[in-house]
Amino acid sequence: MMRKALLVFSLLLSVAAASANPAETTEALDIGSRLELFVDDYLIESMNGVQLRLHSPRSAGQVLAFDRPWEGNTSLYSTVFRDGDIYRLYYRGSSHPDYVVRPLMETGEEVVPSHPQVTCYAESRDGLNWTLPDLGLVSFNGSRHNNLCRFSRENAEGVGVVHDPHDPDPKRRYKAFYWEHSVRSPHKIPVAVEINAMSVSFSSDGKNWTNHPGNPVIPQASDTGHQAMWDPFRKVFVAYGRFGAGGRRIARSESRDFIDWSPSQLVFAADATDTRSRGGRPQFYGMGTTIYEGAYIGLPWLFWENSSNRLDVQLASSRDGIHWQRAGNRRTLIPNGKKGTWDGGCIFTASQPLQGLGDRIFIFYSASRHDHNYTKRK
């Protein structure tokens, strides 16, 4: 069985050198008391004899191995965030059809020869040591002793979760955004609703979820991990995915209530510079996104199709979440390991991947030993 795991990197971004080069007398930007990352040129009027240098993050290694039967052979997408004294982690599992029963199947129904999606839940006090609570919510092969949550009528893929403690309705203080799609199989097991679009669910505790009765909320599909967050400056919820992007590119949508979403807007795509760097047909498979101290920090997943067929991670930033600037001269931030090692194939950063812990910033991501073309990634 292939191995897959949740990993952590510790990150430092800095200016490579200092220079006494006073700017001309202009009105300074008021940044208040917030911290600022020198990840773009937004705060820099001019530079002479200095450069911005992207430092390589230091790996903290594997912190959670996905090896339970219900986690299956493809655990790619995740969400992680701090909630009071704990970190919450939601991650995708999908299992090989030879030994997995679809989560919503009734007793006696046939195994579906497809790849049903499940969503798993874990908790941690420090972001490094994780426990998988026995939630008792979803039956898997006749047992509810597992850490599975249920979000949708069918497959919920790439779940992005937001904690919204200020919602006046306590039943909506956790919000989930995901691609909902029906399982198709030669056995033609009937489903209540044939769906292939973006949906949302709500919860009071982050574990027991209720589907929005008006689903879907965006009439487009998105085969990736999804980013959902609250923008405290624009006072809107923001989602990123591939919905309406036209292939492996990144789209954005906004909502004030997490139900009515704006038309999708293309905001991030590969270009000729990416193609020249390694050849093939580079594409953006997804992008882990965090709003950090006044800026959007993006960790785009570069899929090098027809080249290495692997996925690695770069760094980008934006001041409005729409117009993005690539950092570090497009140098790889999180590289693949050697072929055949646990991170030698594909890397997928979490939704809200940057999490502060003391004087460090953690980057959470999952990794696979096999490239994208391998049919049983894990």
Model regions: which residues?
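Bacterial N-terminal signal peptides
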Residues: 6-16
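Positively charged n-region of N-terminal signal peptides that target proteins for export
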Residues: 1-5
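Carbohydrate-active catalytic/glycan-binding domains of CAZyme proteins
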Residues: 21-378
